[in-house]
Amino acid sequence: MPRPFKMLYIAEAGLHNTSTHRLWAFERLGQHVVAADLTHFGQRGGELVRKVRFRLQMGPAVNAFNREVLRLALVHQPDLVWMDKQLMTQPSTLRTLRQMGIATVNYTIDNPFGPRKDPGWRLYLKTIPEYDLHLVQRDQNITDYKQRGAREAIKIQTAFEPTTQFPPPPQWSDKDRDREVSFIGNPYDQRAEFMTRLWREFDVPLTVSGSARWKCLDREVYDAVFREGELYDKDYREGIWRSKINLSFVTHSNLDEFAHKSFEIAGMGGFLLQERAPGHLERFIEDVECAYFSSVEECVAQIKRYLPDEAGRARIAAAGRQRAVASGYDNDTQMRKGLEALETIVPAVKRGMR
Protein backbone atom coordinates (compact mmCIF):
# COMPACT_ATOMS: atom_id res chain seq x y z
CA MET A 1 0.00 0.00 0.00
CA PRO A 2 1.45 3.42 -0.95
CA ARG A 3 1.99 6.12 1.62
CA PRO A 4 -1.28 7.93 2.43
CA PHE A 5 -1.47 11.57 1.32
CA LYS A 6 -4.04 14.27 1.73
CA MET A 7 -4.92 15.09 -1.86
CA LEU A 8 -6.89 17.91 -3.46
CA TYR A 9 -8.24 16.21 -6.58
CA ILE A 10 -9.33 18.65 -9.30
CA ALA A 11 -11.33 16.63 -11.82
CA GLU A 12 -14.65 16.47 -13.59
CA ALA A 13 -17.17 14.54 -11.50
CA GLY A 14 -19.84 12.09 -12.64
CA LEU A 15 -20.13 8.35 -13.03
CA HIS A 16 -19.55 8.63 -16.79
CA ASN A 17 -16.05 10.04 -16.28
CA THR A 18 -12.96 7.89 -15.81
CA SER A 19 -11.70 10.60 -13.45
CA THR A 20 -14.29 9.28 -10.99
CA HIS A 21 -12.85 5.78 -11.39
CA ARG A 22 -9.43 7.18 -10.47
CA LEU A 23 -10.95 8.86 -7.42
CA TRP A 24 -12.32 5.51 -6.29
CA ALA A 25 -8.90 3.94 -6.77
CA PHE A 26 -7.28 6.61 -4.59
CA GLU A 27 -9.79 5.95 -1.84
CA ARG A 28 -9.22 2.19 -2.04
CA LEU A 29 -5.48 2.89 -1.78
CA GLY A 30 -5.96 4.69 1.52
CA GLN A 31 -5.65 8.28 0.29
CA HIS A 32 -7.51 11.15 1.96
CA VAL A 33 -9.10 12.81 -1.06
CA VAL A 34 -10.87 16.15 -1.25
CA ALA A 35 -12.50 16.16 -4.69
CA ALA A 36 -13.43 19.37 -6.47
CA ASP A 37 -15.21 19.61 -9.81
CA LEU A 38 -14.49 23.09 -11.20
CA THR A 39 -15.84 22.53 -14.71
CA HIS A 40 -18.51 25.20 -14.16
CA PHE A 41 -15.84 27.88 -14.63
CA GLY A 42 -15.38 26.71 -18.21
CA GLN A 43 -19.13 26.80 -18.81
CA ARG A 44 -19.59 30.50 -18.07
CA GLY A 45 -20.91 32.77 -20.81
CA GLY A 46 -22.51 32.12 -24.17
CA GLU A 47 -21.43 29.60 -26.77
CA LEU A 48 -19.10 31.97 -28.62
CA VAL A 49 -17.45 33.11 -25.38
CA ARG A 50 -16.90 29.50 -24.32
CA LYS A 51 -15.37 28.55 -27.67
CA VAL A 52 -12.97 31.51 -27.66
CA ARG A 53 -12.03 30.91 -24.03
CA PHE A 54 -11.37 27.23 -24.67
CA ARG A 55 -8.98 28.06 -27.48
CA LEU A 56 -7.17 30.89 -25.70
CA GLN A 57 -7.56 29.82 -22.04
CA MET A 58 -7.67 33.38 -20.76
CA GLY A 59 -10.17 35.81 -19.29
CA PRO A 60 -12.18 36.29 -16.06
CA ALA A 61 -13.39 32.67 -15.83
CA VAL A 62 -9.83 31.34 -16.11
CA ASN A 63 -8.66 33.74 -13.42
CA ALA A 64 -11.59 32.72 -11.20
CA PHE A 65 -10.75 29.04 -11.66
CA ASN A 66 -7.20 29.63 -10.46
CA ARG A 67 -8.31 31.70 -7.48
CA GLU A 68 -10.63 28.86 -6.47
CA VAL A 69 -7.81 26.30 -6.67
CA LEU A 70 -5.69 28.42 -4.33
CA ARG A 71 -8.63 29.02 -2.00
CA LEU A 72 -9.29 25.28 -1.73
CA ALA A 73 -5.60 24.65 -1.09
CA LEU A 74 -5.59 27.22 1.74
CA VAL A 75 -8.72 25.73 3.29
CA HIS A 76 -7.74 22.05 3.07
CA GLN A 77 -3.93 22.24 3.32
CA PRO A 78 -3.31 19.13 1.19
CA ASP A 79 0.01 17.40 0.66
CA LEU A 80 -0.58 17.57 -3.08
CA VAL A 81 -2.92 18.87 -5.75
CA TRP A 82 -3.72 16.35 -8.49
CA MET A 83 -4.95 17.98 -11.71
CA ASP A 84 -6.86 15.67 -14.04
CA LYS A 85 -6.33 17.43 -17.42
CA GLN A 86 -7.12 20.92 -16.18
CA LEU A 87 -6.49 23.19 -19.17
CA MET A 88 -7.31 26.42 -17.28
CA THR A 89 -4.48 26.12 -14.76
CA GLN A 90 -2.03 29.03 -14.82
CA PRO A 91 1.73 28.66 -14.21
CA SER A 92 1.56 31.21 -11.38
CA THR A 93 -0.95 29.01 -9.53
CA LEU A 94 1.44 26.07 -9.59
CA ARG A 95 4.31 28.25 -8.39
CA THR A 96 2.18 29.53 -5.52
CA LEU A 97 1.23 26.00 -4.51
CA ARG A 98 4.90 25.02 -4.45
CA GLN A 99 5.67 28.03 -2.25
CA MET A 100 2.95 26.74 0.09
CA GLY A 101 4.78 23.39 0.27
CA ILE A 102 2.13 21.62 -1.83
CA ALA A 103 3.24 19.27 -4.61
CA THR A 104 1.40 19.29 -7.94
CA VAL A 105 0.60 16.44 -10.33
CA ASN A 106 -0.70 16.58 -13.88
CA TYR A 107 -2.55 13.51 -15.19
CA THR A 108 -3.47 13.70 -18.88
CA ILE A 109 -4.63 10.89 -21.14
CA ASP A 110 -4.72 13.03 -24.28
CA ASN A 111 -1.70 14.13 -26.26
CA PRO A 112 -0.93 17.86 -26.61
CA PHE A 113 1.88 17.01 -29.04
CA GLY A 114 -0.08 14.77 -31.41
CA PRO A 115 -0.97 15.46 -35.05
CA ARG A 116 -4.68 15.80 -34.22
CA LYS A 117 -4.04 19.44 -33.26
CA ASP A 118 -6.89 19.65 -30.75
CA PRO A 119 -7.54 23.19 -29.46
CA GLY A 120 -7.25 24.27 -25.84
CA TRP A 121 -3.60 23.44 -25.06
CA ARG A 122 -2.14 26.99 -25.15
CA LEU A 123 -2.02 27.59 -21.39
CA TYR A 124 -1.41 23.93 -20.55
CA LEU A 125 1.88 23.91 -22.47
CA LYS A 126 3.09 26.85 -20.40
CA THR A 127 2.45 24.94 -17.16
CA ILE A 128 4.57 21.92 -18.06
CA PRO A 129 7.76 23.17 -16.30
CA GLU A 130 5.81 24.05 -13.14
CA TYR A 131 4.27 20.69 -12.25
CA ASP A 132 6.27 18.47 -9.92
CA LEU A 133 5.13 15.32 -11.73
CA HIS A 134 3.49 14.51 -15.06
CA LEU A 135 1.75 11.18 -15.60
CA VAL A 136 1.50 10.45 -19.32
CA GLN A 137 0.43 7.63 -21.62
CA ARG A 138 3.15 7.36 -24.26
CA ASP A 139 6.90 6.75 -24.33
CA GLN A 140 7.22 9.66 -26.76
CA ASN A 141 5.45 11.93 -24.28
CA ILE A 142 8.27 11.46 -21.77
CA THR A 143 10.62 13.06 -24.29
CA ASP A 144 8.06 15.67 -25.35
CA TYR A 145 7.40 16.83 -21.81
CA LYS A 146 11.06 16.90 -20.80
CA GLN A 147 11.91 18.94 -23.88
CA ARG A 148 9.29 21.41 -22.65
CA GLY A 149 11.02 21.60 -19.27
CA ALA A 150 9.13 19.00 -17.23
CA ARG A 151 10.69 18.34 -13.83
CA GLU A 152 9.63 14.69 -13.87
CA ALA A 153 7.43 12.56 -16.12
CA ILE A 154 6.53 8.89 -15.87
CA LYS A 155 4.36 6.65 -18.00
CA ILE A 156 1.27 4.91 -16.71
CA GLN A 157 -1.51 3.42 -18.79
CA THR A 158 -5.25 3.70 -18.93
CA ALA A 159 -7.05 0.96 -17.05
CA PHE A 160 -10.28 -0.86 -16.32
CA GLU A 161 -12.33 -0.07 -13.21
CA PRO A 162 -12.86 -3.31 -11.24
CA THR A 163 -15.97 -2.15 -9.37
CA THR A 164 -17.97 -1.51 -12.54
CA GLN A 165 -16.07 -3.36 -15.30
CA PHE A 166 -16.16 -7.02 -14.33
CA PRO A 167 -17.04 -10.31 -16.10
CA PRO A 168 -20.60 -11.58 -16.65
CA PRO A 169 -22.20 -14.28 -14.49
CA PRO A 170 -20.62 -17.75 -14.84
CA GLN A 171 -23.40 -19.23 -16.99
CA TRP A 172 -23.34 -16.37 -19.53
CA SER A 173 -23.19 -17.68 -23.10
CA ASP A 174 -24.06 -16.85 -26.70
CA LYS A 175 -27.73 -17.27 -25.91
CA ASP A 176 -27.39 -14.06 -23.86
CA ARG A 177 -25.54 -12.19 -26.64
CA ASP A 178 -27.50 -10.17 -29.20
CA ARG A 179 -24.54 -8.25 -30.67
CA GLU A 180 -22.51 -10.36 -33.09
CA VAL A 181 -19.57 -8.08 -33.97
CA SER A 182 -19.58 -4.94 -31.90
CA PHE A 183 -17.82 -1.62 -31.52
CA ILE A 184 -18.66 0.82 -28.73
CA GLY A 185 -16.82 4.12 -29.04
CA ASN A 186 -16.09 7.08 -31.32
CA PRO A 187 -15.31 7.29 -35.07
CA TYR A 188 -11.75 8.58 -34.73
CA ASP A 189 -9.29 8.18 -37.59
CA GLN A 190 -10.69 5.97 -40.38
CA ARG A 191 -13.09 3.93 -38.24
CA ALA A 192 -16.21 5.04 -40.11
CA GLU A 193 -14.67 3.82 -43.38
CA PHE A 194 -13.57 0.59 -41.65
CA MET A 195 -17.10 -0.09 -40.35
CA THR A 196 -18.60 0.74 -43.72
CA ARG A 197 -16.38 -1.80 -45.44
CA LEU A 198 -17.12 -4.49 -42.84
CA TRP A 199 -20.84 -4.12 -43.38
CA ARG A 200 -21.06 -3.22 -47.07
CA GLU A 201 -18.26 -5.27 -48.65
CA PHE A 202 -18.13 -8.28 -46.34
CA ASP A 203 -21.65 -8.47 -44.93
CA VAL A 204 -20.37 -8.57 -41.34
CA PRO A 205 -23.23 -8.63 -38.76
CA LEU A 206 -22.07 -5.38 -37.16
CA THR A 207 -23.44 -3.26 -34.33
CA VAL A 208 -21.99 0.15 -33.50
CA SER A 209 -22.85 2.25 -30.45
CA GLY A 210 -21.55 5.66 -29.48
CA SER A 211 -22.12 9.37 -29.86
CA ALA A 212 -23.89 11.36 -32.57
CA ARG A 213 -20.52 11.62 -34.33
CA TRP A 214 -21.42 8.34 -36.03
CA LYS A 215 -23.82 10.30 -38.23
CA CYS A 216 -20.73 10.73 -40.39
CA LEU A 217 -21.60 7.28 -41.75
CA ASP A 218 -23.50 6.95 -45.00
CA ARG A 219 -27.20 6.99 -44.10
CA GLU A 220 -27.75 3.43 -45.31
CA VAL A 221 -24.85 2.15 -43.19
CA TYR A 222 -25.87 4.23 -40.17
CA ASP A 223 -29.42 2.89 -40.23
CA ALA A 224 -28.14 -0.67 -40.56
CA VAL A 225 -25.44 -0.79 -37.88
CA PHE A 226 -25.97 2.00 -35.33
CA ARG A 227 -28.07 1.36 -32.24
CA GLU A 228 -28.41 2.15 -28.54
CA GLY A 229 -26.48 5.45 -28.69
CA GLU A 230 -23.83 6.18 -26.07
CA LEU A 231 -23.38 3.45 -23.45
CA TYR A 232 -22.07 4.19 -19.96
CA ASP A 233 -21.60 2.36 -16.70
CA LYS A 234 -24.00 -0.62 -16.44
CA ASP A 235 -25.14 -0.22 -20.06
CA TYR A 236 -21.53 -0.16 -21.29
CA ARG A 237 -20.65 -3.25 -19.27
CA GLU A 238 -23.68 -5.14 -20.51
CA GLY A 239 -22.98 -3.97 -24.07
CA ILE A 240 -19.59 -5.71 -23.85
CA TRP A 241 -21.15 -8.79 -22.26
CA ARG A 242 -23.80 -8.97 -25.00
CA SER A 243 -21.18 -8.89 -27.77
CA LYS A 244 -19.71 -12.06 -29.22
CA ILE A 245 -16.76 -10.13 -30.67
CA ASN A 246 -15.62 -6.75 -29.34
CA LEU A 247 -13.50 -4.59 -31.67
CA SER A 248 -10.84 -2.19 -30.40
CA PHE A 249 -8.67 0.31 -32.29
CA VAL A 250 -5.60 2.44 -31.57
CA THR A 251 -6.18 6.18 -32.08
CA HIS A 252 -3.32 6.98 -34.46
CA SER A 253 -4.21 10.68 -34.66
CA ASN A 254 -3.36 10.90 -30.96
CA LEU A 255 -0.18 8.79 -31.36
CA ASP A 256 -1.65 6.30 -28.89
CA GLU A 257 0.29 3.11 -28.18
CA PHE A 258 -2.73 1.16 -26.94
CA ALA A 259 -6.48 1.51 -26.54
CA HIS A 260 -8.13 2.17 -23.20
CA LYS A 261 -11.04 0.11 -24.48
CA SER A 262 -8.85 -2.99 -24.80
CA PHE A 263 -8.16 -3.06 -21.06
CA GLU A 264 -11.85 -2.49 -20.32
CA ILE A 265 -13.01 -5.27 -22.65
CA ALA A 266 -10.49 -7.70 -21.16
CA GLY A 267 -11.41 -6.63 -17.63
CA MET A 268 -15.06 -7.34 -18.36
CA GLY A 269 -14.30 -10.79 -19.74
CA GLY A 270 -15.21 -9.93 -23.31
CA PHE A 271 -13.69 -11.50 -26.40
CA LEU A 272 -11.24 -8.90 -27.70
CA LEU A 273 -10.41 -8.49 -31.40
CA GLN A 274 -8.04 -5.54 -31.50
CA GLU A 275 -5.82 -3.68 -33.91
CA ARG A 276 -2.32 -5.12 -34.07
CA ALA A 277 0.03 -2.54 -32.53
CA PRO A 278 3.28 -2.81 -30.53
CA GLY A 279 1.60 -1.55 -27.36
CA HIS A 280 -1.10 -4.20 -27.64
CA LEU A 281 1.30 -7.00 -28.55
CA GLU A 282 3.34 -6.22 -25.43
CA ARG A 283 0.24 -6.59 -23.26
CA PHE A 284 -1.80 -9.45 -24.76
CA ILE A 285 -0.59 -12.70 -26.35
CA GLU A 286 -1.98 -13.24 -29.84
CA ASP A 287 -4.58 -16.01 -30.18
CA VAL A 288 -4.18 -16.79 -26.48
CA GLU A 289 -5.44 -13.66 -24.69
CA CYS A 290 -7.00 -11.84 -27.65
CA ALA A 291 -7.14 -11.88 -31.44
CA TYR A 292 -5.53 -9.29 -33.72
CA PHE A 293 -6.03 -7.65 -37.10
CA SER A 294 -3.95 -5.27 -39.22
CA SER A 295 -6.43 -4.65 -42.03
CA VAL A 296 -10.11 -4.88 -42.85
CA GLU A 297 -9.44 -8.15 -44.66
CA GLU A 298 -7.66 -9.71 -41.68
CA CYS A 299 -10.39 -8.48 -39.36
CA VAL A 300 -12.97 -10.23 -41.54
CA ALA A 301 -10.89 -13.42 -41.53
CA GLN A 302 -10.72 -13.34 -37.72
CA ILE A 303 -14.46 -12.74 -37.50
CA LYS A 304 -15.13 -15.73 -39.75
CA ARG A 305 -12.77 -17.81 -37.62
CA TYR A 306 -14.08 -16.91 -34.19
CA LEU A 307 -17.74 -15.98 -34.61
CA PRO A 308 -18.89 -19.63 -34.89
CA ASP A 309 -16.40 -20.82 -32.24
CA GLU A 310 -18.05 -20.03 -28.90
CA ALA A 311 -15.70 -22.30 -26.94
CA GLY A 312 -12.62 -20.70 -28.50
CA ARG A 313 -13.90 -17.22 -27.75
CA ALA A 314 -14.68 -18.17 -24.16
CA ARG A 315 -11.20 -19.61 -23.66
CA ILE A 316 -9.45 -16.52 -25.05
CA ALA A 317 -11.73 -14.11 -23.17
CA ALA A 318 -10.99 -15.88 -19.88
CA ALA A 319 -7.25 -15.75 -20.56
CA GLY A 320 -7.50 -12.07 -21.48
CA ARG A 321 -9.32 -11.32 -18.24
CA GLN A 322 -6.68 -13.25 -16.26
CA ARG A 323 -3.90 -11.30 -18.01
CA ALA A 324 -5.58 -7.96 -17.29
CA VAL A 325 -5.78 -8.76 -13.58
CA ALA A 326 -2.35 -10.40 -13.24
CA SER A 327 -0.53 -7.67 -15.16
CA GLY A 328 -2.21 -4.81 -13.35
CA TYR A 329 -4.31 -3.27 -16.11
CA ASP A 330 -6.68 -1.99 -13.41
CA ASN A 331 -7.02 1.49 -11.92
CA ASP A 332 -5.60 0.60 -8.51
CA THR A 333 -2.33 -0.70 -9.96
CA GLN A 334 -1.89 2.23 -12.31
CA MET A 335 -2.72 4.90 -9.71
CA ARG A 336 -0.38 3.19 -7.26
CA LYS A 337 2.49 3.88 -9.68
CA GLY A 338 1.79 7.59 -9.54
CA LEU A 339 1.44 7.63 -5.76
CA GLU A 340 4.70 5.73 -5.31
CA ALA A 341 6.51 8.30 -7.46
CA LEU A 342 5.17 11.00 -5.13
CA GLU A 343 6.67 9.43 -2.02
CA THR A 344 9.94 11.30 -2.59
CA ILE A 345 8.47 14.33 -4.37
CA VAL A 346 5.97 15.41 -1.70
CA PRO A 347 8.54 15.60 1.16
CA ALA A 348 10.99 17.45 -1.10
CA VAL A 349 8.38 20.08 -1.96
CA LYS A 350 7.48 20.48 1.71
CA ARG A 351 11.14 21.13 2.50
CA GLY A 352 11.41 23.62 -0.36
CA MET A 353 13.89 21.37 -2.19
CA ARG A 354 12.12 21.42 -5.60
PLM regions with names:
Residues 2-55, 60-76, 84-92, 115, ...:
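Nucleotide-sugar donor-binding catalytic core of glycosyltransferases
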Residues 308-340:
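A charged, aromatic-enriched C-terminal amphipathic alpha-helix characteristic of glycosyltransferases
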Residues 105-118:
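A short, histidine- and acid-enriched strand-loop-helix "catalytic/donor-clamping" loop
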Residues 290-296, 305-310:
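Conserved acidic donor-binding segment of nucleotide-sugar-dependent glycosyltransferases
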Residues 83-85, 97-104:
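Short, conserved structural micro-motifs that define repeat-unit consensus positions
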Residues 307-308, 339-353:
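Short, hydrophobic alpha-helical segments
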